[in-house]
Each structure stands twice: as structure tokens, then as C-alpha cells.
Amino acid sequence: MALQLRGNTKKKYLYPMILVTGGTGLVGAHLLIHLLENGKSVRAVYRSIASKEKTKHLFSYYHRSDLFEKIEWIEADILDIPSLEKAFENIEFVYHCAALISFDPKDEEAIRKTNIEGTANIVNFCLAFGIKKLLFVSSIAALGDSNSVEKIISETTEWNPEKPHSDYAISKYGAEMEVWRGQQEGLDVLIVNPGIILGPGFPNQGSGVLFTAVAKGLSFYTKGTTGFIAVTDVVETSLKLMDSAIKNERFTLIENNYSFQEILNCIADSLQVKKPQWHAAPIVMKVFWRIDWFLNTFLFQKRKLSRASAKASYSESKYDNSKISKFLDLKYRSVKDYIHTISGN
């Protein structure tokens, strides 16, 4: 649906700019650092002062506090159309990293609204403002499902709506449909589907929770398998894709497939703490999520483990990352080496 824009959208700036949504999250904040290091003029969307402080802390972690002051911040919400209009003035390229991540079933409506409707709004503004290219940071959760014939999941693996998926996965898949809709309407787009992204600066969200849990003495592990990648490699790949002539493609981004046990042990070694000792078998995880449901339902504690995330912890999902190497010359850093680097050991 075409947007009806208010006022004069042709305000003159000295230089065209790059817009980053989700600039207060792990990927978006790292993306801001790399863009500014490359001399780009950058605008970022934020929703609260507290969220901006997390990004400021990350710049300090990398000793680039000087660059933080060069960001043009716009207070906006991807669900609020009037605030987005100002954010898109004089923008040429858009990195859409904003997303709501939760595996609490009670957040289903908020997840779908933010991730699908919010992405639809971004796509509509890109079309209305004549954006040259949109890069959307999706997830391997939005890729298809392995089966008896196709054991390794890739960009071409078919999504099966009949199979159970987490609300987050469904929302990311729906968001991708909005991006492809924009492509059909004339917008040049790119989609990247990273695995579990590891990186510093956000200990209480995303993969940072793994480091925090191990540091606090996490006692159990699971033997599920999935793809992992360093945040710096996600950012470098995204930058190279945006700067290239590549368009209307989708790429799985992982360094390799690892078991959760391997990653948790590596984190424990890097932090010089005890490794998780107890194997939580699938039946145990099924009990855990039911206990978690009980505590939430009757004692009003926030959900920490949904049925979908419990299943993911013991599912062996393996991903094919070969497509991106056919388009770009990249060598990803070993995730295990990266874990030691960001842990300071």
C-alpha cells in the first residue's frame, strides 16, 4: 500500500545517508561502528535513552567513543509511521536490523506485530522514498525444514507451514515475505539469515545470555546442533553485499555448525569456569518447559523456556553456508577463537 507522506520530503542535506534500524541491538550497534569507521554518514533509530546507552557502551568497549558522537539519532518506532517519515529523509540505503526476540508464548502478538508489520512499514517507506537498496537481517529460524530427503538446510529449503515453528521463526518468515513483496514492487533487496550470532556488549539478551549463564555456573548442556557466527562476520558480509551490485538474493550466514555442548564448553574454557556437567536429554527438556509453563501460569513468573526453544535445544539442525562464497570472497573467523577473544582469554 502506497504511503501518503506529509510535507516536504526533499529536505536538502550535505551528504546522502545510511539508515540503520535496530542500532541499539547486537548487529545494528556493530554495524554502526563499521559504517562510521568507513567514513559513512549514518542515521540510527532508537526508542529509549537506555537503549542508546547500550550502544554507547559498545563503542567504548572497542575504544571508538569518538565515533558515537557522529551518529544522527532519531527517536522512532518501526510501528509508528509519523516518526519513521523523519527517519527516512535523505536516506539512500537501509539496513533493517530491528526485531523483537522472545520465546515467551505470551509475546506472540507483539512479536508478529513488530517483526512483520514493522518490516512492512520499512519496506513501504523504502518504496516511497526511492531507497536504492534494503538489506534485511533475518535469521536461520526463517529457513525451511530439513526432512528425510534434504538433511542440510539451505536458502532453497522449503518452509513447511504444517510443521511446528516458534513465534519468532514465523514472524521472521512473515517479515521476509514483506521484503520480497517490496522487491516485486521495484525495490532492490537483500536478505541475510545468520545463525546464532555471538558478540560482546549485550550480556542479558540474545546469545549474550549463554555467556552469562555459563559464568554463573550453568550445570547442564544439550546435544542439539545449529549454526553459529561471529557478529563481526555478519556485519562485514552485510557491508560487502550492500556495496556490491548483488541484489534480490538471500544468504545463509554461519561459520560452521556446532553442538550446544561444544559452544558451552568453549565459553566455559574462555571464562575459566567449570563446564556444564549434566546432559539434559530431550525428555528432561520436555519436563523443563512444562515446569516453566506451570510457574508462569500459576505463579506469574516470566517464561524462560518455551516448548519451541526446548525442542530447538536438542534438535540437530545443520545449515549449508556455501552460497555466499559463490558471490563474495570471504573467510569467516572460527567461532571458537572468537569466543576466546571476546571473553578476554
List the model feature ranges, each with a label.
Residues E108-E109, E117-S166:
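Conserved Rossmann-fold NAD(P)-dependent oxidoreductase catalytic core, especially the SDR/UDP-sugar
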Residues I18-N38:
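N-terminal Rossmann NAD(P)H-binding glycine-rich loop of SDR-like oxidoreductase domains
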Residues S60, R64-E117:
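NAD(P)H-binding glycine-rich loop region in Rossmannoid oxidoreductase-like domains
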Residues T237-K302, N321, K326, K331-S343:
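Mid/C-terminal beta-alpha module of Rossmann-like enzyme folds, strongest
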Residues Y46-D66:
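Glycine-rich phosphate-binding loop and adjoining beta1-alpha1-beta2 segment
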Residues Q183-V231:
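NAD(P)-dependent short-chain dehydrogenase/reductase
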Residues K163-L190:
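Active-site Tyr-X1-5-Lys
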